[in-house]
UniProtKB/Swiss-Prot annotation:
Glycosylation sites: 100, 221, 436
Disulfide bond residue pairs: 34-50, 54-74
Protein name: Cochlin
GO biological process, one term: regulation of cell shape
Organism: Bos taurus
CDD domains: vWA_collagen, vWA_collagen_alphaI-XII-like
Task of the protein: Plays a role in the control of cell shape and motility in the trabecular meshwork.
Cleavable signal peptide: 1-24
Superkingdom of origin organism: Eukaryota
Amino acid sequence: MWASWIPVLCLGVCLLLPPEPVGSEGAVPIPITCSTRGLDIRKEKADVLCPGGCPLEEFSVFGHIVYASVSSICGAAVHRGVIGHSGGPVRIYSLPGRENYSSVVANGIQSQMLSRWSASFTVTKGKSGTQEATGQAVSTAHPATGKRLKKTPEKKTGNKDCKADIAFLIDGSFNIGQRRFNLQKNFVGKVALMLGIGTEGPHVGLVQASEHPKIEFYLKNFTSAKDVLFAIKEVAFRGGNSNTGKALKHTAQKFFTADTGARKGIPKVVVVFIDGWPSDDIEEAGIVAREFGVNVFIVSVAKPIPEELGMVQDVAFVDKAVCRNNGFFSYHMPNWFGTTKYVKPLVQKLCTHEQMMCSKTCYNSVNIAFLIDGSSSVGESNFRLMLKFVSNIAKTFEISDIGAKIAAVQFTYDQRTEFSFTDYSTKENVLAVIRNISYMSGGTATGDAISFTVRNVFGPVRDSPNKNFLVIVTDGQSYDDVRGPAAAAHDAGITIFSVGVAWAPLDDLKDMASKPKESHAFFTREFTGLEPIVSDVIRGICRDFLESQQ
């Protein structure tokens, strides 16, 4: 029964018609905020009014044409071209959930991919009403009940003491089954909630291991615990073999990229849940993860009983997959029942950043100084080939103010610091400076140059956590002793790679190089032969770095 009746004159006959319900065609559009989501509108069809001037960061959009209900309505409307950034009326239609929401750039908005969601919506041009869009976000009336919704709260910053990018790699195999799969999701949800997810805290995503790995959602998809919990709940059981190794390798290689939300300088973590044992080899996947700087935690549940051990490819699979076999990265629960008491200890591990040893790699935790021969025997054109050699090594590393650092010194009888470790913190700037180094020309005093570099370049960073390397490139015999200065550099913890060209004596190269000499000293007859040595030096740096971390 309608609460009131409105007289309407039609062809001379006065009729009593009920007023249109809120949200129906012809009704005044309901004002909403920039971040109001499709799931906040609980009608099959509703007319809403989007404000103008919404910041793009409030437009969280998943899909194209058909959008997941967790998407911003106004963001979807701008994305589809229904309205512009000045706002306006929008009609929203509720649709069933689906799989594989696509990622598309449209009208200045990048929508995100989502593997599955329980409800969807689409948008069309709405009917204009008496309300007008403004640049101000307003409180919204709830279309289903007529109650006022609370103003959308600001995004939570999260636990700043637990900054980490975390992928939960859950077991979706027939090993675990549907019932224990749901218990696993509940446990992961509790861990996610306790972590303190937020814009400046931990970010999480989820991958399901089964016959083929499936990334359920990425780090960038959700930055609130509420949305993460909802997304975890929506993950469907896949079944198949527990190819955990395949899934771990896929996660290490594809999950932690800038495009998917990985942050610079933040520890990368994969928490692998294994019910029983994996169906494939997990050791190689662990090696790949370490090479990518990913900290692998293994949460094993229900160890195989003696009668099942013959079915396990490698009973030591946990020790071979984790970041370090020191007990910190492995975690065991007897079963999936009564797991609440295991949540806090796991969270404490995930938030202990000083233990995240695999975040440090040879690519982001080294200081590399290049000592470049600028003597007269080199010549301008060959000097440029030397600089190309230096650039090709430098560009391999993750140069930043918290990552790898590069310095360069040119020497003849004299020495000139081209740039120090603290001068440039981006790869682009470092490579540009190397290209523009001018050729000095003069004699060759390599010993003095080593002492100068140790004192003036490495001295200011002696307390740096990065491992120190010196790459010497020379084309001739030094007029001074190299043995003493090189030994002093070794004693100072600096690993030396010596690279000789043309007339450089092999004895000098070996005297300067760190041990074992055969893997730290290189020689080529021609300057064009420097290029193949690039990969040898990079491999050597990474090998020495890994050995120093054992």
